[in-house]
Amino acid sequence: MAKYLAQIVLMGVQVVGRAFTRALRQEFAASKTAAEARGRAGTESAAVSSLSGISFQEAQQILNVSKLTPEEIQKNYEHLFKVNDKAVGGSFYLQSKVVRAKERLDQEMEIQSKTSNPKEET
């Protein structure tokens, strides 16, 4: 009786082990394809971040935008630029941060348009 119980447990462990390794291989393959898909855009975005000195997330926070829509970015940019004007008691430092954030988001929109329309790069 104990012999059969041990065989059943052993077979169960083998089945679970095979299923786990199969699932792990599938996950690695999916992760690899996702990384390759993000590869080019991610590299360009990182290069732009290092050149502009401001990250994409920081630029979104400064201009208070969640989606990259030119109208919303422009509207928030104009408002924050006027509010931080030195003539009305604003801060030149904050005003320059607003300008850098808009430049960074404009660059990100350009990168996204290139990756979504690769045929137009010729």
Curated annotation (Swiss-Prot):
One GO cellular component assignment for this chain's record is:
TIM23 mitochondrial import inner membrane translocase complex
Source organism phylogeny? Eukaryota, Metazoa, Chordata, Craniata, Vertebrata
Q: Which organism is it from?
A: Xenopus laevis
InterPro entries in the record, alphabetically?
A: J_dom_sf (IPR036869), Tim16 (IPR005341)
Q: Which PANTHER family match?
A: MITOCHONDRIA ASSOCIATED GRANULOCYTE MACROPHAGE CSF SIGNALING MOLECULE, MITOCHONDRIAL IMPORT INNER MEMBRANE TRANSLOCASE SUBUNIT TIM16
Does the record carry Metal-binding as a key word? no
> What role does it play?
Probable component of the PAM complex, a complex required for the translocation of transit peptide-containing proteins from the inner membrane into the mitochondrial matrix in an ATP-dependent manner. May be required to regulate the ATP-dependent activity.
Q: Name one GO biological process term.
A: protein import into mitochondrial matrix
- What subcellular locations does the record give? Mitochondrion inner membrane
Write down the Gene3D superfamilies for this protein, in alphabetical order.
DnaJ domain
User: J-like: where is this region?
Assistant: 58-110
Coarse class of the protein's main subcellular location: mitochondrion
Subunit info here reads: Probable component of the PAM complex at least composed of 1 mitochondrial HSP70 protein, 1 GRPE, 1 TIMM44, 1 TIMM16/PAM16 and 1 TIMM14.
Answer whether the UniProt record assigns the keyword Aminoacyl-tRNA synthetase to this protein. Answer: no
Note the topology in the membrane. Peripheral membrane protein
> Which branch of life, at top level?
Eukaryota
Name under which the protein is recorded: Mitochondrial import inner membrane translocase subunit tim16-B
One Pfam family in the UniProt entry: Pam16
Family under the similarity heading: Belongs to the TIM16/PAM16 family.
**Which keywords does this Swiss-Prot/TrEMBL entry list?**
Membrane, Mitochondrion, Mitochondrion inner membrane, Protein transport, Translocation, Transport
User: What does the record say about domains?
Assistant: The J-like region, although related to the J domain does not have co-chaperone activity.
